[in-house]
Structure formats: C-alpha cells, structure tokens
A protein has these predicted regions:
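Surface-exposed loop and turn segments in beta-propeller and other repeat-based domains
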Residues: 29-61, 101-105, 141-151, 188-211, ...
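Repeated scaffold domains used in trafficking and secretory/extracellular systems
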Residues: 65-69, 107-113, 152-159, 196-205, ...
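Blade-level signature of beta-propeller repeat domains, shared across WD40, Kelch, NHL, RCC1
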Residues: 313-353
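C-terminal motif of bacterial Sec signal peptides marking the signal peptidase cleavage site
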Residues: 16-19
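Short coil/turn segments that connect the beta-strands within blades of beta-propeller domains
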Residues: 74-75, 116-118, 163-164, 222-224, ...
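Beta-strand-rich domains and repeat architectures in extracellular enzymes and scaffolds
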Residues: 55-85
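Short loop/turn segments that connect beta-strands within beta-propeller blades
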Residues: 91-95, 133-137, 180-184, 239-244, ...
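Conserved beta-strand positions in repeat-built beta-propeller and related beta-rich domains
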Residues: 79-84, 121-127, 168-172, 227-231, ...
C-alpha cells in the first residue's frame, strides 16, 4: 500500500515537471478597432429670402416717405427721404426710427453717405452737398455752392466719401467733383475749393436717357472709386491714389455690359464680398460678388443671388444695403427688408476603397 502511494506521488511530480517544460496556449478575447470605409457628406446650400419687414409713412409719424437712397454703417441706417426733405435715421437692426436731420427745406436728399464722424448728403436741386454731424444730426457746412462752372455743383445726384476725399456726381456737368476733406473748414458756411474734376465723356448721366429723378450709386471698393450707370450698363472706376496724385488727369476704366447692369452696390461684413442690385437679362436681381469679380467685371457667377418670384417682389430701381444677413431696399414710399436664410441639403458620397 505504501509502495503504491509513493509511486502515484512520483508520477504526479513527473507530470508537474513535464508541464513546466511545455508551451501554454490560451485564446484571449479583447476589443479591437478596425478601420472601416467612412462616407463623406456634401452640403449644398440653398439660400432664399424670407422674413419680410417694411417701413412706411406710418412708421415715421405720418410724414411723407420717399426713400430714394440709403446707407448703413452697421449700427444705423440713413435714408435719403426726398419727399420729406430730410435724412431719416433708423436702427439698422430693428428699423425703428431714431431721429431725422435736415437743413431747413434745403435738404432735397438724393443720396447719403456716412464716413467717420460725418454724414454727407447730395441735395439734388439745392445744388450742394450738405455735411452733418453723424451722431447728433447737427448741420455743419456745405460743398459746391461757388461760381459756375468752377466750383458750383449743377446737380448733386450722388455722393461718396473716403477718409481723405468726398466725391460728388454732377449729372448736368457730366463729371465727378472731388473735395479734399483735409481742406474743409466745418466752421465755414461754404467750402467750394474743388480738388479735382473727373471727366466722364458722353457716357455719363445728364442726357434724356438718364433721368435725374432716378437713384444712382457710387462706392469706394478696394483701391478704387466706382460709379454705375444702370441704363447702359456702364461702370466707371478710378484708382483713388491716381486721383490724389494726378487730380483731373486720373485715368478712368470704362466698361459696358448690355445684359448685366448694376444699379447699386453695398459692402458686407466680409471686406472681400459685396451685394449689388442689378438688372440681369432683363430681370431685377440681388447678387453677391467677390472683390475680384467686381475688379474683373465678371458678373456671370455670383456666390449668391436672389430674383423676383411668387413670394419676393423686387423693385425695378432699388438701392440695396447689407445688414448682417439682411438686405434692405428702397421701394418708393416704403423700405423693404428681407432676411437671407439657408435650407441646406446633404448628399452622402461613399468613400472610394
């Protein structure tokens, strides 16, 4: 019996020793991350106009409203109210009326432009450009009231300004008068020293084909001054530095386009993009273009565009200004505002293996 036990114990020890010399195999289960083909999603934007809002005579206390031009500085909207003989100032976001400014009955406003602390008003038949303090509405002085033809502005139909210069579009004399802001004395009743006259040859307004009752636009874009003649599709531009250095002899770039006729242009939050109101193939459109498009006069491929449809009616001679994805338009006896909205679509594109 004892011998059997000893033999069993010896056998177990030998088995244990043998097992230590063998390789042990185990199946181990663990989480593994395996690369899989991933689909990509293509987003196609679909921008449209909605959220319509208007302002009429009732919103300015029952006074006459004839909005012929406008300008937004991002905080306030300045509206040239020709019938009301004033500039009406609205909150740019809410379009609530804040104040009005005028120089008696002489503010026959055809255009308005804000630059720095001042507001410049092209006063049409008053044959002058009026200067106001932008925040208070205080009248300060006027430009272009001297003797004809040296400094008198025969018809102040349009105005634009940079930190250095003021540009006045004189349709009767078919030129643009330029005033040097550094030489303007805001304490004087009149400032009549003309810095330069930019000739426009026979293309410019003043003929029977360009009625002075219509609204026109000028804008400083990039390094140049642009002036638009919508009936003929003519665009003038001058390098601002050329105007400063060469004055009357500053060369103009003149182009004409019979199918794409810009009436007005507005800066946006992006200094490389602009919104225009234009007639394209006989229909009114609001369209967004890049600075490069404008410089090249390439209006065939806007980044965004909106035309009249069953919901949206665009005035035929509208001036447009951009305000934080909203477009504000002149429309005769009222202001129109449309919000730009987006309803994107998504296209799944499987990745190629």
């Amino acid at each position: 019996m004892r011998k059997d036990v000893m033999m069993i114990s010896a056998g177990l020890m030998m088995m244990a020793m043998a097992s230590c010399n063998q390789t042990e195999y185990r199946e181990i289960t663990e989480d593994r991350v395996v690369s899989q083909p991933v689909d990509t999603i293509k987003v196609a934007d679909h921008f449209y106009l909605d959220g319509y809002l208007s302002r009429t005579s009732e919103d300015i206390g029952g006074r006459q409203l004839n909005a012929v031009n406008l300008f937004s500085d991002g905080e306030e909207l300045y509206v040239a109210n020709f019938a009301g003989k004033c500039i009406d100032v609205f909150d740019a976001e809410t379009l609530g009326l804040k104040r009005s400014m005028s120089n008696g009955d002489r503010t026959l406003a055809r255009d308005v432009y804000a630059e720095g602390d001042h507001l410049f008003v092209a006063a049409g038949d008053s044959r002058e450009v009026q200067i106001f303090k932008k925040k208070t509405g205080k009248y300060l002085s006027r430009l272009g009231t001297g003797s004809w033809p040296a400094s008198n502005v025969s018809w102040a139909g349009c105005v634009c300004a940079t930190p250095r210069l003021v540009f006045v579009r004189d349709s009767k004399e078919t030129n643009i008068r330029v005033f040097d802001r550094n030489a303007i004395n805001l304490g004087a009743a009149n400032n009549n020293n003309v810095y330069a006259k930019l000739a426009t040859d026979s293309y410019f307004i003043g003929s029977k084909f360009e009625p002075q009752s219509e609204s026109y636009d000028m804008e400083a874009i990039g390094d140049s001054l642009y002036s638009f003649i919508p009936r003929t599709g003519t665009i003038y531009s001058w390098k601002v530095q050329d105007i400063i250095e060469k004055k009357n002899d500053a060369p103009a770039k003149i182009t004409q386009n019979a199918t794409e006729k810009i009436r007005s242009i507005s800066k946006t939050d992006d200094k490389e993009k602009f919104f225009v109101s234009m007639e394209k193939d006989g229909k009114m459109q609001l369209a967004e273009y890049t600075l490069a498009d404008i410089q090249k006069r390439n209006f065939s491929q806007p980044t965004r565009s909106f035309a009249s449809d069953s919901r949206v009616s665009l005035p035929s001679q509208t001036i447009v200004t951009y305000q934080k994805e909203k477009l504000i338009l002149t429309n005769g006896t009222k202001l129109d505002r449309w919000e730009i909205r987006n309803n994107p679509s998504y296209e799944i594109q499987p990745r190629k293996k």
